[in-house]
Every structure is written in C-alpha cells, then in structure tokens.
Amino acid sequence: CQKRRFWIKSEVTQTDVTKENLDDFLLKNIDQKFDDNDSFICNPINISGAKKIKIIKRGWRNLIKDPSIIFNPNKETISFHFDMHHGYQNLEKAIELLDEENRNDFKEYVRNRNYYNPHIMCIARPEVLENWFKNLFSWLERCEGEFGFKSLKGYDTQRLYAYLAERYLSYWFKKNTKFNELPWTIINI
C-alpha cells in the first residue's frame, strides 16, 4: 500500500475523495481566474496541539528553555516541531547556511508560525521553478557539507533534506511569488 498525494478541486474536501471516485475530483486544470498567479502550493497544515506527553518526551530541550510551550499551542512553531521530530537544532544549523537574502527572514518565519504548506508540491511557471530549484539546491548542497548522509539514520533524520525543503517551500513561494493555496488529499493506492 502506497500513499499518494493529489491536487483536488477547490470545492471538495479531503474526506469527500476516495480511491474509487478520485478521478471525479482530481484537479486537471487551473481555473482562468488564477491566470495572473505565479505559483500554487498545498493548503497548509497546522502543527500545533501535540499531546503533552509527546512534548515532554521529544521536546524536553525546548521546554527547558521555555516551559510555557506546554501550555501555549501558539509556541508549537515550525522550529519547535522540527526540533521534536527531525533533530534538535538541525533546522537552526541549516538556516545558518542559507544565503544572506533569506537567512533572517526564514529564521523569523519558522520561529513564528505553527503551520506550513506540506509535501513539497507546487505548480509554477518555469522561471519560478528555475529560481526555486537554484536557491533550494544550492542551500541543500551546503547542508550536505554540514550534515552529510552517514549520520542521518532512522525516521527523525534519514530524510532530513526533504524535511528542510518542505519547510522552506512555504516561506520561499510566499516571499517570491504571487501564489495561491490549493486543496490536496492523500489516497492509499
């Protein structure tokens, strides 16, 4: 069984779509009213509201710095979530390797938001994609020098570069393009 992600029509919710009726709800064309958009990214997901025990088990280092996290879901930011699930301070270390133009803004972005646009899925104009990939891969190459591959083991860090790209996509497309968010769904095929 493999989970696949699909763009769906705007008037549909994820729960309406099943494996059997998927073709009826797939997004096959972008509505003309969006012709002046540069890009489309997935509707965001909210990452706050983790169970208290999970915050204690996986976010204890962050709790030592700021115990109020456990009582304030707004403090369960992208940065906090990344620390819990993909290695403490790995996102901060990676951000330090970003180009100067994006470093401080992205740091601010991940420290103050508790949602992001998931799955590294986008639809964009060719020139936008070219700029996105140039910026992303030059950063990820620098990250490879810092993190390598051999030390990245298990769920937490094995796919570290994909997790970094996923968080960066939200920031980059919102900063650099006229974007719109579109619904998506996951179907087990």
Give a label for each model feature.
Residues 1-189:
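ER/Golgi luminal nucleotide-sugar-dependent glycosyltransferases, focusing on the catalytic module
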